[in-house]
Amino acid sequence: MRRDVRILLLGEAQVGKTSLILSLVGEEFPEEVPARAEEITIPADVTPEKVPTHIVDYSEAEQTEEELQEEIHKANVVCVVYDVSEEATIEKIRTKWIPLVNGRTATGPRLPIILVGNKSDLRPGSTIEAVLPIMSQFPEIETCVECSAKHLRNISELFYYAQKAVLHPTAPLYDPEAKQLRPACAQALTRIFRLSDQDLDHALSDKELNAFQKSCFGHPLAPQALEDVKRVVCKNVAGGVQDDRLTLEGFLFLNTLFIQRGRHETTWTILRRFGYSDSLELTPDYLCPPLYVPPGCSTELNHRGYQFVQRVFEKHDQDHDGVLSPTELESLFSVFSVAPWGPELLHTVPTEAGCLSLRGYLCQWTLVTYLDVQHCLAHLGYLGYPTLCEQDSQAQAITVTREKRLDQEKGQTQRSVLMCKVLGARGVGKSAFLQAFLGHSLGEARDRDAPEKLPTHTINTVRVSGQEKYLILCEVNADSLLDTSLDTTCDVACLMFDSSDPETFVQCATIYKRYYMDGQTPCLFISSKADLPEGVAPPGLSPAEFCRRHRLPAPASFSCLGPAQSSIDVFTQLATMATFPHLAHTELHPTPFWLRGVLVAVGTAVAAVLSFSLYRVLVKSR
């Protein structure tokens, strides 16, 4: 909604433009009227809409054509004033003033116009019949108000309607010739209806209607008012109410009725509560609210975010089988301008029988939040998060983690989402490794309507010390790393080489020395294609010797043809190293972390006992 309103008064000389302004401000009819009033600003706190309002007078005798066009350009609404006792001033509306205001606007939005019949005290009856043909000819005319500056009649109402024409315009919502909602308005209201239909039965129950009413207007409807609304709909729209529930047709009819009765601010309140601008598009401020993410921090959904997206899943899982079929997924996407996720989704997250499971769905939300939080905020906005959850913005569904440097200092991360970069030469098996993380063999992945190129990210859940973590695998080709300084930041690095091609290990060793050797990121070398015979090693350190010398864990083995448990163990090891980065460089043998912790504790206790015994011996020897 606009932050201020600029009203311009036009009309023939002596119709009372200046008197109207001075009567509004002084609350009495002025005895002496200047040729033109100075621009007046009415503060927000004394206007019905709580918006500062600038009122500008025009005098044809004092101002030039260029000055008039400049004022028209700056105005938000124009009041064309005529004298109800002078029919010639009515005719000038059609022949002179409206062409001056909007005559140069062939297409696009036109300035809203209010017709103002002044001096109603000089004529009995009304001139509305005379101006109706003009109102029919020019759809930009919002309304006509008859008033009297001398008797202070309808002065406040005149400027209220002018404000209303700017803040709650009719033109974007309603086609007066067709007497129906414009397509963009009907589309926006249809989306709002779908968001408010929590059980997806294509109708709003009393409970859903009251939740909608409270979200938009701050209070529920009284039971009798609710019944009256449904009675009006039943009377006017076949199928507007079914099984005592308001259908989409009934919902659209109600909004049409509001507009036809001059209550279009009601429809605008609904639209703006769900993020729409005056052009009936979701505003950038609504879709992408401010969220500051300092360097070294990451973004995750918090409990409010996960609860909301899980409710959305359950709403669209109409057969309650725990997965979203393609049809159910299409239903979920219906409130978006374009589908947020493409066919690569089924090769990015865990699935069940080719359908999106709840776990995979939550994984996808987690991935988007981590990789591109602005897209996550927009997606939550399309789903109506701020309105349905009664929150200020989607940013309240996001947690910004503490800096990675602090995690490294404390020796443990509080993050629930961990990033693993999988680095290696082309052909070493990185894509197979990523798909194995989802429980797919590479052959299965390529047979299941896969996109031409498999995604470079996959995500799944892993348990670390009894806690569930989300682990993201990101595939990076070693060739690009050796040529350019790409972002190698991650929680754990997985350096993959082909056990049958020793040259690929040399590349991994080079990457390690260049990017990770002097840092604190834990690294794990993985020997892929472990089912193939080992190649002839070139002169130099073997992978095991290299890892031992650099105080790294022993290389792990992986084969897409190997047992599933060995793959799970590798992913668990990566997640554990990311969670406890300070332990990674002391891991010279495949001893489990929990066992090493026990051994350290036992060793400490034994040392304490020996120290105490030695002390007693020394005391006795004295």
From Swiss-Prot:
Transcription found in the keyword field: no
GO BP annotations, alphabetical order: cellular homeostasis; mitochondrial outer membrane permeabilization; mitochondrion organization; mitochondrion transport along microtubule
Record domain Miro: where: 2-168, 415-580
GO annotation, cellular component aspect: mitochondrial outer membrane
Membrane topology listed for this record: Single-pass type IV membrane protein
Top-level division of the source organism's lineage: Eukaryota
Predominant place of localization: mitochondrion
Cytoplasmic side: 1-596
Binding site for Mg(2+) 2: 431, 475
Mitochondrial intermembrane side: 620-622
Residues binding Mg(2+) 1, per UniProt: 18, 57
Top-rank EC class of the record's enzyme: hydrolase
Transmembrane segment boundaries: 597-619
Protein's cellular compartments: Mitochondrion outer membrane
Amino acids binding GTP 2: 427, 429-432, 529, 531, 560
Domain EF-hand: 184-219, 304-339
Subunit comment: Homodimer. Interacts with the kinesin-binding proteins TRAK1/OIP106 and TRAK2/GRIF1, forming a link between mitochondria and the trafficking apparatus of the microtubules. Interacts with ARMCX3. Found in a complex with KIF5B, OGT, RHOT1 and TRAK1.
Domain notes: The Miro 2 domain is necessary for efficient ubiquitination by PRKN.
Protein name: Mitochondrial Rho GTPase 2
Gene that this polypeptide is encoded by: Rhot2
